[in-house]
Amino acid sequence: MSYTKHKTRNISKAANSLQEECIRVPKVYDWVTDQLSVKKKIEFTHEQKKKIEEAMDDPSRRPLRIVCETPYVPPLFSLNKPDHDQCEDFYCEQVGEKRDVTVPVNGEFVDAQLVDLLFTTEIKVKVVDRHGCEVVDVNCNASVMESFVLCYPHGTELMCEISKIVCRIPSGTVLLNCPAPSCFTLEITFCV
């Protein structure tokens, strides 16, 4: 079997060819994802409970629903810069100093850093009637702290991104009959 050698071609560069340039881009040392959940007990005041029961007494407003509104989550941002708290309803911050640790990775021990991160959010919980009209609202804040082992050498910029904040009411969201509940549990999940 014989092979034919390819003909050598001279390809000229276009007149507008780009020259090679160096650009500065961030180097990613580590990336972690997790789901962090916290439960909060939400209590209605006597006045709020009275408004809920008045709405439930009106058949044209039943059923009532409990809904929760989570804040807009910002895009990836640096924790090392002072302007990282641009969103008033959401915070991500490093608590304390990072600590050097040695951890096993693939059978070898490597140096890493242990970092405690605190995630905090403001959530608005509303009771609405069948038409979506607000009966009462309750503001609630929730925080969760988690330790992460990272490759975080000196001079590295720590970035934070929460892809979503989810709130749910495990006991259900529909209110049909009196008496109105005086409290319920709200479960908040931070997707980091």
Predicted region positions:
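Viral structural modules
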Residues: M1-V192
